[in-house]
């Protein structure tokens, strides 16, 4: 789900597992009732199944909801297990998650701007 996200978007993950049979209305109700967030806001909501090999993303586009689904053929997402919790993550943490890494990286390697060999 390597999509270009709109500017200034909030990204939320539903920690723990979600019943992946839920569709747009069920996921939007979960966002509103369980997490007390606005599903119509400028936010991307991510949900993961029990096996951690598939995720759904819910996004309000102004004229309707967009529901995206990704199933990994090999591997699992490093999904936080805090049941009944929603967590806001940064765009960088979103990229880590989609690439199979944990959203809680201890340290990242900084890029070197200088290109001089001594």
Segments and roles (model prediction):
Residues 1-118:
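Polybasic/polar functional segments that serve as interface/processing modules
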């Amino acid at each position: 789900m390597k999509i270009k996200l709109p500017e200034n978007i909030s990204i939320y993950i539903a920690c723990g597992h979600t019943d992946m049979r839920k569709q747009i209305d069920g996921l939007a109700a979960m966002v509103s009732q369980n997490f007390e967030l606005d599903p119509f806001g400028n936010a991307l909501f991510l949900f993961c199944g029990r096996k951690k090999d598939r995720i759904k993303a819910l996004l309000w586009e102004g004229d309707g909801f967009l529901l995206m689904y990704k199933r990994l053929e090999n591997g699992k997402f490093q999904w936080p297990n805090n049941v009944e919790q929603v967590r806001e993550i940064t765009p960088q943490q979103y990229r880590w998650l989609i690439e199979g890494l944990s959203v809680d990286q201890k340290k990242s390697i900084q890029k070197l701007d200088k290109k001089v060999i001594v």
